Amino acid sequence: MPKYFCDYCDTYLTHDSPSVRKTHCSGRKHKDNVKMYYQTWMEEQAQELIDKTTQAFQKGKMGNFGGLPPNGMMMGPRGPMPMMPMMPVRPMGMGGMLPMRPVPPAMMGGGQVMMMGPRPGM
């Protein structure tokens, strides 16, 4: 029967069954090893980026960060900010509710139009 090898923990599991792998992968030591692996990998990637940037800067391939920006990159003076429309202020006694509008008598029946008959006495 083949054994399962965990690359993160650098160990063989006793059986190659899904339940054994699931138990192993949910363990604290395995999770710590996975976290450490990816943390180390990210640190290596960051260091490579730093090294490449340093080499490019030393070779003169990076732009000059000091002084004035290239022509056309200067920003002129800014004008005033446009005013945003203000919401009307309601008195505090309203409690945040919108004012109620009277419902037309023809629309009172659950959204169905009610037919108005002749008035009594006509």
From Swiss-Prot:
The keyword Zinc applies. It is found in: Nucleus. GO terms for biological process: mRNA 5'-splice site recognition; spliceosomal snRNP assembly. Pfam families: zf-U1. The keyword Zinc-finger applies. InterPro entries: Matrin/U1-C_Znf_C2H2, Matrin/U1-like-C_Znf_C2H2, U1-CZ_Znf_C2H2, U1_snRNP-C, Znf_C2H2_sf. GO terms for cellular component: commitment complex; U1 snRNP; U2-type prespliceosome. Keywords: Metal-binding, Nucleus, Ribonucleoprotein, RNA-binding, Zinc, Zinc-finger. Its main location: nucleus. Component of the spliceosomal U1 snRNP, which is essential for recognition of the pre-mRNA 5' splice-site and the subsequent assembly of the spliceosome. U1-C is directly involved in initial 5' splice-site recognition for both constitutive and regulated alternative splicing. The interaction with the 5' splice-site seems to precede base-pairing between the pre-mRNA and the U1 snRNA. Stimulates commitment or early (E) complex formation by stabilizing the base pairing of the 5' end of the U1 snRNA and the 5' splice-site region. Belongs to the U1 small nuclear ribonucleoprotein C family. This is U1 small nuclear ribonucleoprotein C. It comes from Ciona intestinalis (Transparent sea squirt).
